[in-house]
Amino acid sequence: MSDRLVVDSLGVAFGRTEVLRGLSFSVPDGARMAVIGPNGSGKTALFKALIGALPSTGTIRWAPGTRIGYVPQRLDLERDLPLSGHDFLHAKATLVQASEADVTRALRLVTLGRDVAQRPIGSLSGGQFQRLLLAFALLGHPSVLLFDEPTTGIDEPGEELLYATVERLQREEHLTLIFISHELSLVYRMAGLVLCLGRRGVHCFGPPRQILTPETLERTYGAPMDHYLHHAHGP
């Protein structure tokens, strides 16, 4: 299988503070990769470097023709604006030259009905708004989806629907999925690869069930993780 992404010796700094240094990994086309690590380990900085929103050193090589959809953890958008979900999507559609058919397709892919899309964005639940952001990312017909902590602020039923939607999309659209998560249960469920970032660099990279040992997690997070590892595997 060919690689969709190859990263070699990536570095990111904010002023004199290094956030990432010497980061190297590759992601096969169609793979699902999770990025885990404590706050401040550079997970979001990595995503922003991958989409060109942060300057970086080293090399980021996407396969030719790669189109990226990015779903942020949160969006700086006033939720009390008199703006419907449909209007929100149309604003993006104008930027990427997407058609009304593309908007309809994106809503269908995330199972968000037109009745919901016509409502003001401030009235949407956390799960509905997250699926709206996912539809927003899908308007450009991406081959890669970057998802920053997909379940932040969502209740359990909303989480399950979002998981199912993303898994189905990844299969049907043959997307390469790269997501950030603090939930090891989600990592085990959805990821074929995991990249562990700690405050002192990369602590592991590979299939989660092979590399997420208590020792690796303790090095990554700086504290024992036996409880979380057990919870991730289930009772």
Predicted regions and their residues:
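Conserved ABC ATPase signature
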Residues: 120-124
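Catalytic Walker B motif of ABC-type/P-loop ATPase nucleotide-binding domains
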Residues: 145-148
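H-loop (His-switch) and adjacent beta-strand-loop-beta switch element
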Residues: 194-207
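H-loop/switch region of ABC-family ATPase nucleotide-binding domains
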Residues: 181-182
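Helical segment within the ABC ATPase nucleotide-binding domain
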Residues: 160-172
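Conserved ABC ATPase "signature" region
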Residues: 100-116
